[in-house]
């Protein structure tokens, strides 16, 4: 079972590291091409392209300039510990043990606009470049055209290495659009998390992102290898709803949070 998640905009390069193991990202030659494009951008370009404040634009112009082809523990940290958005709040990687990290290294991948596909312990220099960014590049007008089949091919390598042909899609639509499901050597299963609000169950972004992280952790901690076991997920009050699920979409619901 291979899990795919989105990255996060919020980053943490300050907290103490809970593991000193690390690996090198595999698609740096592609990242380098994107960095060369991004280094041509002014702060005003970045603010407009990424729809961010001048302060965040300045920060990221600096990051593009400082980015180095050499990834070391001094200028980078493991991706699973550097990302800090809602998904990663649910994942709580800082409390995983060494065996969990080893398992995650084989069974978890993070999609990324700049790095393409990251293993949990891959070193990552700080950046902001979302997959949906309309950044003109040598291969087209956006990052989906830039990455083409590269991410899908890397996922197929990971699927082959970890032993079955099931991919659990815990990524957002924006990121999973960078994957070509028909070319994957796997059955794609997408968990859907719905929260009760005013008497109706719907996907509420903040809760759903956190739940995706919790499910990734559930798979890692419990070494889940079958879809049947996946339906036993019950973290934070979620429960599986069989009658609303299909072979490719697993629906989980939760009562209103007070």
Curated annotation (Swiss-Prot):
GO cellular component, one term: cytosol
Cross-referenced PANTHER family: PEROXIDE STRESS RESISTANCE PROTEIN YAAA, PEROXIDE STRESS RESPONSE PROTEIN YAAA
Top-level division of the source organism's lineage: Bacteria
Recorded family membership: Belongs to the UPF0246 family.
Coiled-coil residue spans: none
Record-given protein name: UPF0246 protein VV0659
Pfam families to which the protein is assigned, alphabetical: H2O2_YaaD
InterPro entries for the chain: YaaA
GO biological process: response to hydroperoxide
């Amino acid at each position: 079972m291979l899990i795919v998640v989105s990255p996060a905009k919020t980053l943490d390069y300050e907290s103490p590291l809970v593991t000193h193991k690390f690996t090198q990202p595999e698609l740096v030659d592609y990242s380098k091409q994107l960095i060369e494009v991004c280094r041509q951008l002014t702060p005003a370009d970045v603010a407009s392209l990424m729809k961010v404040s001048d302060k965040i634009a300045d920060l990221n112009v600096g990051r593009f300039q400082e980015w180095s082809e050499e990834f070391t523990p001094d200028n980078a940290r493991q991706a699973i510990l550097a990302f800090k958005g809602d998904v990663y709040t649910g994942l709580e990687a800082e409390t995983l043990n060494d065996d969990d990290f080893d398992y995650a290294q084989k069974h978890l991948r993070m999609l990324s606009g700049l790095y393409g596909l990251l293993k949990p312990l891959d070193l990552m220099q700080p950046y902001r470049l979302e997959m949906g960014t309309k950044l003109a590049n040598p291969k087209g007008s956006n990052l989906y055209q830039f990455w083409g089949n590269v991410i899908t091919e890397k996922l197929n390598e990971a699927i082959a290495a970890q032993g079955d042909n099931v991919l659990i899609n815990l990524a957002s639509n924006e990121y999973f659009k960078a994957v070509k499901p028909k070319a994957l050597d796997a059955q794609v299963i997408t968990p859907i998390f719905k929260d009760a609000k005013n008497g109706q169950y719907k996907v509420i972004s903040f809760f759903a992102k956190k739940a995706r992280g919790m499910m990734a952790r559930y798979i890692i901690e419990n070494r889940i290898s079958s879809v049947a076991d996946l339906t036993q997920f019950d973290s934070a009050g979620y429960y599986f709803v069989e009658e609303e699920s299909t072979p490719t979409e697993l629906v989980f619901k939760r009562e209103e949070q007070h």
